[in-house]
Amino acid sequence: MRALIQRVSEASVTVEGELLGEIGPGLLILVCAMQGDGEAQASALAARIAKLRIFRDEAGKMNRSVRDTGGAALVVSQFTLAADTSRGNRPGFSAAAPPADGERLYRHFAAEIAACGIPTATGRFGADMKVRLLNDGPVTIWMET
């Protein structure tokens, strides 16, 4: 699985004007299941992100996790993280998991983040979503399993 993690002051996701999820300080996690991924990869990635120390401590160092700060997570599916741009001008997405697998793993990943004790909001798999965020730092991290 692949994830693009952004430390945010706030973030929200809407579909057709309907607010699906919003958070205050925490993490916006854009996530993509890849061909061959399973629940083990989704669980491992969620556990790593839950422990990722990218929030400032009292000394201003990135030494605290989202759990340590009492922050939340907004988890949004984004199959375009599977883009292959090695040839031509149009990205290919064949490395992404098939939609049924992608949705199952997206839901599993979000549930695993929540099981780590992190308040979790989500988008809608496969929908045309509008994501708003106020990046804090900015801090943006790429992770893969």
Swiss-Prot record:
Please give the record's comment on domains.
A Gly-cisPro motif from one monomer fits into the active site of the other monomer to allow specific chiral rejection of L-amino acids.
Q: Cite a single GO MF annotation.
A: tRNA binding
> Is Hydrolase a UniProt keyword of this protein?
yes
Sorted alphabetically, the Gene Ontology BP terms of this entry are: D-amino acid catabolic process
- InterPro entries referenced in this protein's UniProt entry, alphabetically: Daa-tRNA_deacyls_DTD (IPR003732), DTD-like_sf (IPR023509)
Motif: Gly-cisPro motif, important for rejection of L-amino acids; annotated at 137-138
Record's subcellular location: Cytoplasm
This chain's protein is named D-aminoacyl-tRNA deacylase
Source organism per entry reads Cereibacter sphaeroides (strain ATCC 17023 / DSM 158 / JCM 6121 / CCUG 31486 / LMG 2827 / NBRC 12203 / NCIMB 8253 / ATH 2.4.1.)
Q: Which UniProt keywords apply?
A: Cytoplasm, Hydrolase, RNA-binding, tRNA-binding
Q: Name the EC number(s).
A: 3.1.1.96
